C-alpha cells in the first residue's frame, strides 16, 4: 500500500480519539500525519492562562500531543495531570508547560514543536492560527455571545446560531498548516463539537481556502451523540449540512457514520443530560452524492460514549483503499 499524507482538522476529545488510532499507522499506510487544531477554547485552565498570558488556547493542543505521543505512559500522564488545591487548582500540567515554553522561546509554534519532541509524537500538531482568537456567535434572537463555553451555554436555552466568526477577524494561519493541506492526500474533518471544535478552524480564511482548493479526498466524521446547546436533535446529515453552511467548504466526498446504539445503562444517562445518539440518515446523505461508510464505531469508557480509536482507524483505512488508492 502506498503511504499517504493525512491531515486531520478539529479539536477536543474527538480529534484526540482519531489521532490515537491513526498514529499506529504512521510508517505503515500513513507517510505523514498532521493535526490542525483549534485554539479558540476559552474555558477551564486554558481560559485562565489565555487571559493572563495572552496566548492561543493550549488545551486542545496538549490533548493532541498526548494522543500522538510515543513517550512512556508516565510522561503522558504527567502532561494530563491536573493540580488540586489553592492557586493552581484545575490547571493541567501540560498547559502550564506549553505556556512556559511559549514565554521561553517567544513563540507558541516553537513551544508546540519542542513539546512534541519531548513527548516523541508520531505526527505534527499545528494550530489553525497562531493568533489569540475568540469565537463569537450571533443567535436567532439577535444576541451576540463571545467565547466557546458561553456560546454552548446560550445554545442550551433553545437558541440557534445564525452566524459565527473569530475575533480579531481574518487571523493568519501558520504557513506549515497551509503546506500540509496542499500536500495532503486525505483530509479528515471531525469528530468533535461542531460549532466550538471543528468550525473555528475553518473561520481562519487561509485554512478554509486551502481546504477548498485541495484535491485531497475530504472525509467528514459525524459525531456519535448530539451535544446540548450545539447539535440538539441533529441527524448525521444535519451535522454535515451545518458544517458546509458555516465553513464555506463546498463539499465533502465521504461521510463516516456510526450505526451502533450505546448500552442501555449509558444511553439512559445520556438521555437524562439531553443527549441522544445521532440518527444515521444514510439515504439522505447519499442523495447529496456523498459516499457513506456506516458502521459500529463506538467505544464505551466509564460514563462516556465516544468513537473507538481502533474502529475509526479501520474505517479510515478502508476509505483509503476503496476511495483513494484503488483509483490511483
Swiss-Prot record:
GO cellular component terms given for this protein: cytoplasm
One MF annotation (Gene Ontology) recorded for this entry: LPPG:FO 2-phospho-L-lactate transferase activity
UniProt key word Metal-binding: no
Keywords, comma-separated and alphabetical: Cytoplasm
Transmembrane segments: none
Gene3D superfamilies according to UniProt: CofD-like domains (3.40.50.10680)
Domain of life: Bacteria
InterPro entries: CofD, CofD-like_dom_sf, Gluconeogen_factor
Keyword Cytoplasm in record: yes
Family annotation (Pfam families): CofD
GO biological process: regulation of cell shape
Subcellular localization: Cytoplasm
HAMAP family: Gluconeogen_factor
Function recorded in the entry: Required for morphogenesis under gluconeogenic growth conditions.
Family recorded in the similarity comment: Belongs to the gluconeogenesis factor family.
Name this polypeptide is given: Putative gluconeogenesis factor
Organism of derivation: Aquifex aeolicus (strain VF5)
